[in-house]
């Protein structure tokens, strides 16, 4: 018998979120459905009963999946079935993972699988803002050890107003779009994009999010209590030896502290740390060094390294590479470093290096997006690659991983608002990380800015980025904020806070917190210190490349855009695409046309200006309106005894009367040397107001012969007197069958 339990959360604006358990997926360790209007997600959690041997980390796997049926759609492709995860699904999975992972106990190593499935959607309420709540609620109603609950919300600012979990329509107009995850007491994760906002405005958005999250966390606690899941399962995944722990600390700490304050480079420092632990192990015999003991020594020595690094910073202000807490590593930059790409740059900061390239494309290069809720075309792409050799690892290069997609997305969001809305090119930025020792995604932002400017992309403003760190103790009462963190400072520290922006404000951010007790004061100070670092790096970028390249590189495609009336779209395309295909074949240019906002938007691209100009001329001829007094190049389509019909514009014929061919009198058109198919210059001299027929003249374009006398104009009938009697000519003879009268073509 079903006995579902549910809780309702009020958002404060009339909307509600309902969490329910006990109805679906009851064999999972925990399962809930979360509903907001017509958006419904199911979240389940399952954990192994014990940890696998040798595992000393948290093997958490979060999978967010969307069903096309949720929105009443069929999947694409031959199989008509959901396939591998989309970028949106991967990014949503990462948002949930980053919020949950720090809250599992440090000594809990059993495999945990979190599955979140979108079963219903209406396109208005976005499911990624509900996924974190669903996952945490599923853990709350399970017996899996978890120091939650948490929740995630999206906050947008539209017309100066902060909105929690905005609709898709509200989000389109927002200048702030951030996702925030938190417990009742602490912020855990922030990620989002902004339109050059100030640090105080971003901080206010985080505060608004946290207030909403507190309500959602309390609802989860009530749900957990109603389910009777307040007691968590027992586990023992680590064997400990307090005497060994003390011995490792006593014999290794001083040596580790000396290395931590030596200011040595990454590999030298790594070798020195490794030498210390190897020397410690050497005091034991092979029989004594069991696998269990080796695992404990490694774990205890890791704690020693961490303590040494943190104490050196907190007590002496000395960082691993010898820098001060606010100091940025040395930067060197090279632009236009590769001849083939349309733009290129190398950005190196300390031991982190990005080689970024830019490719400019046309409309045909747009990326088609066909997710469940998101479908359309993307014109600005950024791809981030992190090969193993960048950290000196000897292993095979696999496909694109979740981390690469996440880092690339952050850099993409940092730069995309700085590309002009009306920029005609499709742009692809590729960042290949060639060296890495922290802040590689921020190096991507800086290298991407440089490569875009080298390609001649007229960015609104250049963007720089920096990664900030934190070392704190005693609930944040004693702390040090670190600018431009190293990989080890990220790993052993309490915060990874990435901030990107222009001289006028923040464009994107990503923050992960690993400790309790991060105050808003620390966040405010971190943002202020980050701004100083960003401005320093931006100065280096502007020194290397003060302005964007004025013109594209010679081998970059050229694009020209035309706007035509909606009524001309069919004429340009032609029956079955005949006209537009003919233009492309004749000129060598690529032509695409779309109806946008009630007009026809034509994009013409080619490898050189001549091909584009030829295509533009052909299109203008199709859409042009004939004007009296204009001169046209036409083709004689047919010859008659009284003149010639000339196609002077596509689909438009006019009469070139025999008297308008030349200044001298002609008996036949052929006397002027004209024949069908000839090209002739004509001037449009008149348009019949009743019939719309066109009257052309060739002779007005020819020099008037010397001594030529104009024939006097024919007098009006009144001056010529009455018509004379026809006399004895009798009635008009039968004219016979002369056939149909020739019609003018217009």
Swiss-Prot record:
Pfam families noted in UniProt: KH_1 (PF00013), PNPase (PF03726), RNase_PH (PF01138), RNase_PH_C (PF03725), S1 (PF00575)
Reactions listed under catalytic activity: RNA(n+1) + phosphate = RNA(n) + a ribonucleoside 5'-diphosphate
Subcellular location: Cytoplasm
Basic and acidic residues composition-biased segments: 706-746
One CC-aspect GO term: cytosol
SUPFAM superfamilies, per the entry: Eukaryotic type KH-domain (KH-domain type I) (SSF54791), Nucleic acid-binding proteins (SSF50249), Ribonuclease PH domain 2-like (SSF55666), Ribosomal protein S5 domain 2-like (SSF54211)
NCBIfam families associated with the record: polynuc_phos, PRK11824.1
Entry function: Involved in mRNA degradation. Catalyzes the phosphorolysis of single-stranded polyribonucleotides processively in the 3'- to 5'-direction.
Protein name, entry field: Polyribonucleotide nucleotidyltransferase
UniProt organism field: Parabacteroides distasonis (strain ATCC 8503 / DSM 20701 / CIP 104284 / JCM 5825 / NCTC 11152)
Lineage: Bacteria, Pseudomonadati, Bacteroidota, Bacteroidia, Bacteroidales
């Amino acid at each position: 018998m079903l006995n579902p339990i549910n809780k309702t959360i009020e958002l404060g604006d009339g909307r509600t979120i309902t969490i329910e358990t006990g109805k679906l997926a009851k064999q999972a360790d925990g399962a809930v459905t979360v509903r907001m209007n017509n958006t419904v997600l199911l979240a389940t959690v399952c954990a192994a009963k014990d940890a696998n041997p040798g595992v000393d980390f948290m093997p958490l796997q979060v999978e967010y999946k969307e069903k096309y049926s949720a929105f009443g759609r069929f999947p694409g492709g031959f199989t008509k079935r959901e396939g591998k995860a989309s970028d949106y699904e991967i990014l949503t999975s990462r948002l949930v993972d980053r919020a949950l992972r720090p809250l599992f106990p440090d000594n809990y190593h059993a495999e945990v699988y979190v599955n979140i499935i979108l079963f219903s959607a209406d396109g208005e309420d976005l499911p990624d803002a509900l996924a974190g709540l669903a996952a945490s609620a599923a853990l709350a109603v399970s017996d899996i050890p978890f120091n939650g609950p948490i929740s995630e919300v999206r906050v947008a600012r539209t017309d100066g107003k902060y909105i929690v979990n905005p609709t898709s329509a509200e989000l389109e107009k927002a200048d702030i779009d951030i996702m925030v995850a938190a417990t009742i007491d602490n912020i855990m994760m922030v990620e989002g994009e902004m339109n050059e906002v100030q640090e105080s405005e971003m901080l206010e958005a985080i505060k608004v999010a946290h207030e909403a999250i507190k309500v959602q966390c309390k609802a989860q606690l009530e749900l957990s209590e109603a389910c009777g899941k307040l007691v968590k399962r027992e586990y023992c995944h680590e064997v400990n030896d307090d005497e060994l722990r003390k011995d490792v600390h006593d014999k290794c700490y001083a040596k580790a502290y000396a290395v931590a304050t030596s200011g040595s480079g990454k590999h030298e420092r790594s070798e020195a740390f490794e030498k210390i632990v190897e020397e410690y192990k050497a005091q034991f015999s092979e029989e004594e060094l069991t696998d269990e003991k080796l695992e404990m020594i490694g774990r205890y020595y890791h704690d020693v390294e961490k303590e040494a690094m943190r104490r050196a910073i907190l007590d002496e202000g000395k960082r691993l590479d010898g820098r001060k807490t606010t100091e940025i590593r040395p930067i060197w930059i090279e632009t236009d470093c590769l001849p083939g790409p349309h733009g290129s740059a190398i950005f190196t900061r300390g031991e982190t290096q990005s080689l970024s390239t830019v490719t400019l494309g046309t409309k045909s290069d747009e990326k088609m997006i066909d997710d469940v809720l998101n479908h359309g075309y993307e014109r600005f792409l950024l791809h981030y690659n992190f090969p193993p050799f960048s950290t000196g690892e000897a292993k095979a290069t696999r496909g694109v991983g979740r981390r690469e997609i996440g880092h690339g997305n952050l850099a993409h969001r940092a730069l995309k608002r700085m590309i002009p809305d009306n920029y005609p090119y499709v742009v692809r930025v590729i960042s290949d990380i060639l060296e890495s020792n922290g802040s590689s995604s921020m190096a991507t932002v800086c290298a991407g800015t440089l490569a875009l400017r080298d390609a001649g992309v007229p960015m609104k403003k250049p963007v720089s980025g920096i990664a900030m760190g934190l070392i704190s103790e005693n609930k944040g009462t004693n702390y040090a904020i670190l600018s431009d963190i190293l990989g080890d400072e990220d790993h052993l520290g309490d915060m990874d806070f990435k901030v990107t922006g222009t001289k006028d404000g923040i464009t994107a951010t990503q923050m992960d917190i690993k400790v309790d007790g991060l105050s808003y004061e620390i966040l405010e100070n971190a943002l202020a210190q980050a701004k100083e670092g960003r401005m320093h790096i931006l100065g280096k970028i502007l020194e290397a490349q003060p302005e964007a390249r004025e013109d594209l590189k010679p081998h970059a495609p050229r694009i020209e855009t035309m706007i035509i009336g909606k009524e001309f779209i069919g004429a340009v395309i032609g029956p079955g695409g005949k006209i537009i295909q003919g233009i492309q074949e004749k000129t060598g240019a690529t032509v695409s046309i779309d109806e946008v906002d009630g007009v026809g938007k034509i994009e013409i691209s080619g490898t050189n200006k001549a091909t584009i100009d030829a295509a533009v001329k052909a299109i203008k001829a199709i859409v042009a309106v004939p004007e009296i007094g204009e001169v046209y190049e036409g083709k004689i389509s047919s010859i008659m005894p009284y003149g010639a019909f000339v196609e002077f514009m596509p689909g438009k014929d006019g009469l070139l009367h025999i008297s308008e061919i030349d200044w001298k009198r002609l008996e036949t058109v052929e006397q002027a040397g004209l024949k069908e198919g000839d090209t002739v210059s004509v001037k449009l001299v008149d348009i019949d107001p009743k019939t719309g027929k066109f009257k052309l003249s060739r002779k007005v374009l020819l020099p008037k012969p010397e001594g030529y006398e104009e024939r006097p104009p024919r007098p009006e009938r009144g001056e010529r007197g009455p018509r004379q009697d026809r006399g004895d000519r009798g009635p008009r003879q039968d004219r016979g069958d002369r056939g149909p009268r020739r019609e003018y073509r217009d």
